[in-house]
Amino acid sequence: MKMRLWKSVLKYAGAVIFFLVVAYGFVPQVLGGKIVNQSDISGYVGMAQEANSWDREHPDDKTAWTNSMFGGMPTTMITGNSKGDLTQKIYNAFLFGKRPAPYLFISLVGAFLLMLSLGVNWILAIGGAIAVTFCSYNLQIIQVGHNTKMMALAWLPWALAALIFTYKSALKKDAGWKTWLSLSTLGAALFGMAVNFQIKANHIQITYYLAIIIFCYVIGLFIWLIIDAERRKTIGRFFAASFLLLFLGLAGIGSNANKLIPTYEYSRHTMRGGSELSADGADGDKKTKGLDLDYATAWSYGWEELPNLMIPNYNGGSSSGGVNPDKSHTINTLRQYGQGNLKDVAKSLPMYWGPQPFTAGPMYMGAVTVFLFLLGLFLCKGMQRWWLLAATLIAVFLGVGRHFMPFTEFWYYNMPFYSKFRTVSMALVILQFTLPMLGFYALDRILKGKYTAEQFRIPACIALALTAGFCLLLVIFPGIAGDFASSSDSQMPGELVNALREDRRMLLSNDALMSMIMVLITWFLIFWACSKPKSSDDAKAASRSRIAAISICIVLSLNMFTIGKRYLNADHFVRPREFNGQFAQRPVDKMILEDPELGYRTVDLSVNIFNDSHPSYWHRNIGGYSPVKLQRYQDLIDRHLGGEINTLIKKINSAGTMTALMEDFPSLPVMSMLNTKYIILGGDSAPIINPQAMGQAWFVDNAVFAASAEEEIGLLDDIDLSTTAVFGPDSGADEAGIPARNPEAIDIQNDVIYMTSYAPNELHYHYEASSDRLAVFSEIFYPSDWKMSIDGQETGPEIWRADWTLRSAVLPAGSHDIKMRFEPRSYSLSSNISMASSALLLLLLLASAGLFYFTSRKSR
């Protein structure tokens, strides 16, 4: 008994060590001190610099607001809130090591456990783990820096494994109530912890897809139980296990309340919450709830590119794909044109010719995995086939988005939270789990002798024809895939377009041949294992099955690693010094930072203003990059800032000299109300100073009340914002409370207001007013959580929204000091919920482990 236990321990410990070797072996550059040159992490470093610097210097007063992007915004989706969560340190411990190797390791172990929960042999479970982890999409998102998404995907199989383990323990035949209850409680506690970690990764869209998979499994299991009289006897256990999973799952969710509640509160005011403005600029009750449907479905997988689940270059692969420079028609053509650096050019060519705007690569699931999935679909009976097929079909229908609008619109308008998500093609990540789950479940049953060669033969031939047969057709007749033309080809010379099409054709044929060979080898190995003579003894049969299992895992691994290296390889790694060099202070940054004035902002015309956060590293920036910026600021960009910037650029280009520009400086009312003082043209040239910048705050003499949101934002162009404030119907302003200007007051021209101290979460001003005055602050308005006090009093004037997106308040006469501080109420409430939930989760996990230990000892 003990010997068998030790063998099991060594076997599974060996698998974990193997996964560690694989994780670091795939990215050996990290052992040499290199890091992945991730574009999204570059963006994060820029946007988070102000908040992170402040938090390091003020650990007891961490900021929940930054002014580094879009004039100012909460840090909810940048740095977040981890206060109160007792499991955060455990989560961080799993990430110990040289990233991204820990991401791969966590995914490998989780997928291994998932395969084991299905009853798959441990050798095949290793292959299944590799199939799940090394899907090309995972490597693409690591390369660009979608680390939160990768971590959410890495923890997803842990949650599924715990879920399946819990139900299987509860429904186990002949198990006494103490045994099944202790096992189910332990499984539910592990499920709660896995859900906790999966949500903690902070990618709610992936969590949403996890919920879809769980829903399909639970409904499938319930139907499977009730359709059979014998199985219906265990329905009570099903509900007991479901209650445990629900309770501990909620504890796992509650542990992340410190992130979820602020995120929910913030999302209502962002692009995910919708706009008050109509698309055509007309008045009316046309406020959208969530993202615009066209925007949300812009990245929709085409029906015609679904074969790249099995053939990576079916639609060209990547919008910046690589080719062999010695065999490429495109490179030969460019060589004739005298193009230099051809080896570098060959690494990044527009090879993709599918329906999406652009893409980093295909959702390649593996030719072997797709073949095994189809084999399982035709061979397996019972629940596993149907619930996995249901989850797969839902994922495909969601992933194709605008190409299946009835289904997409139903989800968009009826399913909770779905309208908050973009990039609908992401739903295909569900296939990263459902395809290997059914495929390796089927393979395991075949190699365990659950099916005879006769039972296997017809389903295997059908699966072979659909995969290897389809690949063979593409090798012989690649033109059946299409004309190899991309919408971007029209911008290129005809000769170059023809060369690109030939390269795309070649890439397709090569990958189709590769996939065909992989499938044929897999089919042969399975057929060989199933075709053992009847006279064979059990030992020889087991040996044959083991050889087939190991061989298939090796074939799959070689295929997944080879394709994976297209999207994450040595070229994507750099030294930390090289990565940080992109944030080096430029001469123009140094010139601007020498200005002692507080509160000014910049706009950098040398970058993509609203899609680049590098300038935010050094400055309070009116640009930046965020898919969850405040919706009112996005409205400001769409209706005013974009146009003003275009006008400014045209004027700069036509002026010729700085003197001519300043003599005929364009009107920039919205940029000026944002106190955009410096206009950056390039890193080495002096910035332009905006003579119209309105300063940190100013008193206004008049107020205009708009009847609608459309009128409110339209008035910003029509009035003098330095003397008049614009209030909308929901601005919170009290028209009767606004002081009337006294035309006889001779001291009004001496009234003054200015900033005296700046911190991202706390602003101080001093003002002198001869009478009660309405002041406008060049700071972005955010409902509720910014509070104002005067002269140290606990309460102060109410902050109103003015000029579409700025703050304003009525200030009493006299000489006074103002403090404006950002303290989100959701942070303190959510931190308390997180602490209570995480404490409960840890206690229940320990208690369930103890219960299982004592129950198992007594049973022995």
Positions of predicted regions on the chain:
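Helix-to-loop transition at the C-terminal end of transmembrane segments
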Residues: G25-G43, A257-T270, F404, F477-S486, ...
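Transmembrane signal-anchor helices characteristic of membrane glycosylation enzymes that use polyprenol
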Residues: K11-Q49, L248-I261, I394-F397, C471-L472, ...
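Transmembrane-helix signature of polytopic, membrane-embedded enzymes
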Residues: M115-F134, D174-T185
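Membrane-interface coil-to-helix junctions
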Residues: F19-L108, I130-I142, H146-A154, K286-M365, ...
